[in-house]
Amino acid sequence: WFDEYLDEYPTWHINTSTPIFLLIDGTYYCGHCLIVYRAENLKRTIYYRFTRSEDDDEIASDLMNIRSMGYNVIGITTDGGDNIIRAVEYVYPDVPRQRCMVHVQRECLSSITLHPRTPEGRMLKSLIMSLSDIRTHNDMMWWLSRYNLWVEENEEYVCEKACLPNSTRTYFVRNDLRKAYVHLRRAIPNLFEFIKHPGLPKTTNALESFFGHIKDQLRLHRGLSETRVDNFIKWYLYFNDEKKSKR
């Protein structure tokens, strides 16, 4: 019976009248990419794509299909991928877009590490880690005041340049620290939309956890053909949604 399932794939219908907060993220498996569009407030997958990479034209096409299907998207949460961001801004320019806070933290910490050597780096790490504690408008304002003070006191130091020996070319003396600072600075305009729009997820953690479960299941079923792998994922999406809808 298992093979019979994988020779075909399911279809399902979701009510389009309910306003939705959309999560968008992609994951790679077996040389392929799965992009999932999930209505997080409904705990339902409304669209997905099997592709080779996170292509902005394809994602924009998916979003236009979602819009034409009648879904009322009132907020979107994404990671920091440029392709996804460009597609969202093209199709839904006026819809609030939340940057995944965990992705921002992860990217910044990959530059300065968990154990920064300088006081400036340790202060920035403290700011980055404390993002997780923000719940209210007052929390946000307090965090921004600390961030602005850090910038005022350290931006010149962080962005210091020097000349290469025997050359007019310059480089950033503390490039890792600067990369973390620039990444955080660019994320801030879309980092606190979840406060202005209650219900909008501040992370894509739900999808990342879901992707982890899918990959665990695929490892248990090694040897499936490409078509059956894709159908396996479609059934997994379907049964996961059905289980959530019956709770």
Model-predicted regions and their roles:
Residues 75-85, 122-247:
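Acidic/histidine-rich catalytic cores and adjacent linkers
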Residues 30-33, 100, 108, 159, ...:
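Generic recognition of cysteine residues
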Residues 4-6, 11, 57, 101-111, ...:
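Short alpha-helical interface patches
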Residues 76-82, 87-128:
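Conserved beta-strand -> loop -> alpha-helix junction used to position metal-binding or nucleic-acid-contacting
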Residues 1-82, 86-94, 187, 206:
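RNase H-like nuclease fold core
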Residues 55, 100, 132-136:
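Alpha-helix N-cap recognition
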